[in-house]
């Protein structure tokens, strides 16, 4: 009847609007990878499913590559997918390693399911508000971090297939990645794997739907088909991504299928400068001079004043509160100048707003005012405090 048709139209319009807001309209430009993605949903009614992909720029010119899937299809699966995608982006901004990102995401899913169980016995309607939270239990996620400075690639998986890697020499293989439990299911801690990728390698992150479509073929057959498709890929990433999807996934798939392909890039050595600094207050002046000379070589003299201020404050903090060894690094990205100070400390610095009578405590406040953004990330031998400035000078 007319009412049913109108209701169908409203639901479909709402679903399509949700889809447009959940998946990235376009993948962000950054210096770590060249990326392309394709998605083919199983739900014919709405074109929606629980699979997602993402590319997230990180500090230090790095990028996070993400593919995940929520059980089920349709608008409810898509809503839970959007919740997890937002959570992953929030955790990525903290600079956490892949295994810790998945550990926090696992806790989020488990607590959401517990909240639903607790609300189910409450007043009428209260349980319905949380009813969809349990749908995220059993979700899978693959989280990869790639560093274009040294080619290191770290990754961890929660109930999700390992990515394939197509190397520049033509070989294709699947990464030997420990498989953690699905999100919210409980189990042993997540483990990370790390490898070094040559420039021009292609990572193929995918969901289960790319490898298996009902009883059409086995998982082993699907892996073999993907390897052959990657061997036949072209040089241009976007049509290659579409070609792989078309070769492996039917027009009406049994399961949602998502594919994210990323070709690794390397920053030229001339766009990275690094200095070892002694734990000596006199090193601050030398660090400022070295940074200023490097900016001159890069044609970025207009950033010398703010960069010297950032270097002075971050190096001084490292000497005063953390100790050595201390390293200063400048990275020139296409659109950003990154200043990093590495020290052996294990505590996160906090931005404070000093009173007018205070004689100190303004360092990080100044850094936050003169830079685009700043933050801290922990590494095995200490921490890195970083700050970014937007580039205005000509590219060299």
Model-derived segments and their meaning:
Residues 1-2, 8-12, 16:
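Amphipathic, heptad-repeat alpha-helical coiled-coil "signal-transmission/dimerization" linkers
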Residues 338-361:
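Glycine-rich/acidic phosphate-handling loop/turn and adjacent ATP-lid/helix
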Residues 31-39:
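Long, charged, glycine-rich C-terminal linkers/tails
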Residues 7-12, 24-28, 44-71, 75-76, ...:
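Conserved subregion of the PPM/PP2C metallophosphatase catalytic domain
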Residues 318-319:
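Short helix-loop "hinge" at the ATP-lid/N-box region of the Bergerat-fold HATPase_c
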């Amino acid at each position: 009847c007319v009412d049913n048709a109108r209701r169908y139209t409203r639901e479909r319009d709402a679903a399509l609007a949700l889809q447009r807001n959940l998946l990235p309209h376009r993948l962000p430009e950054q210096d770590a990878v060249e990326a392309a993605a394709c998605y083919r949903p199983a739900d014919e009614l709405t074109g929606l499913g629980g699979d997602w992909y993402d590319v997230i720029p990180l500090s230090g010119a790095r990028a996070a590559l993400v593919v995940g899937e929520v059980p089920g299809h349709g608008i409810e699966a898509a809503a839970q997918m959007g919740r997890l995608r937002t959570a992953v982006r929030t955790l990525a901004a903290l600079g956490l390693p892949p295994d810790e990102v998945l550990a926090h995401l696992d806790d989020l899913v488990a607590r959401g399911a517990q909240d639903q169980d607790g609300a189910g016995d409450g007043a009428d309607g209260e349980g319905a508000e949380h009813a969809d939270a349990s749908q995220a239990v059993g979700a899978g996620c693959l989280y990869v971090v790639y560093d274009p400075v040294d080619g290191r690639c770290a990754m961890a998986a929660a109930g999700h297939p390992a990515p394939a890697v197509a190397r520049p020499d033509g070989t294709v293989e699947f990464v030997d990645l420990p498989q953690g439990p699905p999100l919210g299911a409980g189990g042993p801690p997540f483990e990370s794997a790390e490898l070094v990728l040559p420039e021009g390698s292609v990572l193929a992150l995918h969901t289960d739907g790319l490898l298996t479509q009902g009883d059409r073929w086995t998982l082993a057959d699907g892996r073999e088909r993907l390897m052959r498709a990657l061997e036949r890929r072209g040089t241009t990433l976007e049509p290659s991504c579409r070609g792989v999807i078309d070769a492996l996934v039917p027009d009406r798939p049994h399961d949602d299928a998502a594919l994210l392909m990323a070709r690794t890039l390397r920053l030229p050595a001339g766009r990275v400068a690094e200095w070892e600094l002694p734990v000596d207050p006199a090193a601050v002046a030398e660090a400022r001079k070295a940074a200023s000379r490097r900016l001159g070589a890069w044609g970025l003299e207009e950033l010398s004043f703010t960069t010297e201020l950032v270097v002075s404050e971050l190096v001084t903090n490292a000497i005063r509160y953390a100790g050595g060894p201390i390293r200063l690094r400048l990275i020139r990205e296409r659109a950003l100048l990154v200043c990093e100070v590495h020290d052996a400390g294990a505590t996160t610095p906090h931005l404070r707003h000093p009173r007018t009578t205070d004689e100190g405590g303004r360092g990080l406040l100044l850094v936050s005012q003169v830079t685009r953004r700043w933050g801290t990330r922990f590494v095995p031998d200490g921490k890195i405090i970083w700050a970014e400035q937007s580039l205005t000078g000509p590219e060299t």
